[in-house]
């Protein structure tokens, strides 16, 4: 039954979204929308000098599953690297599509959405936050790379 998807933990994560809002001066912003249901996540980030997420905020308008995914992402994002986020996204996709175990380490909490695998129409809404975070970090890294090249060229 689809009601089994909405456990107390999922509803708790959905109701207590960490780091809600927007950053005033993000280095990267990612937005993802689940076309089927309209769930949407906008994520803003800044990075530290080692390309780890230094600050993070999210504006999420989603169903309980999308909100729950965003809740886990909000708890885990600070300090994460692009590689960690990408691995978590890939592991989550494998969990939903092909029976994988799901993310580990800092994003292990996304495993709470494992039973969403049985409901393909809910996959995209469960993914909006991690996908938006990945896009935001990719954008911020490109900006950091451009700024580094500009500083090097200016020093020459």
Where are the regions a protein language model picked out?
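C-terminal binding/interaction regions
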Residues: 1-21, 30, 80-156
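Structured beta-strand/loop patches that form or line metal/cofactor-binding pockets in enzymes
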Residues: 13-60
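Functionally engaged cysteine thiol sites
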Residues: 37, 63, 125
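Short, surface-exposed, polar/charged, turn-prone segments marking secondary-structure boundaries
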Residues: 42, 51, 74, 83-87, ...
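Short, thiol/selenol-centered motifs that function as redox-active sites or metal-ligating centers
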Residues: 60-67
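Alpha-helical support elements that line or immediately flank enzyme active sites
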Residues: 69-81
């Amino acid at each position: 039954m689809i009601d089994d998807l909405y456990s107390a933990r999922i509803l708790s994560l959905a109701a207590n979204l960490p780091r809600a809002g927007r950053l005033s001066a993000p280095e990267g912003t990612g937005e993802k929308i689940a076309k089927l249901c309209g769930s949407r996540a906008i994520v803003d980030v800044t990075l530290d000098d080692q390309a780890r997420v230094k600050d993070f905020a999210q504006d999420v308008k989603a169903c309980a599953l999308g909100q729950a995914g965003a809740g886990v992402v909000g708890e885990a994002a600070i300090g994460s690297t692009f590689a960690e986020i990408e691995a978590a996204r890939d592991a989550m996709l494998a969990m939903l599509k092909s029976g994988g175990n799901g993310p580990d380490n800092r994003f292990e909490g996304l495993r709470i959405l494992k039973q969403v695998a049985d409901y393909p129409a809910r996959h995209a809404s469960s993914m909006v936050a991690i996908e938006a975070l990945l896009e935001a970090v990719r954008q911020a890294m490109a900006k950091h790379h451009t700024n580094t090249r500009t500083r090097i060229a200016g020093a020459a």
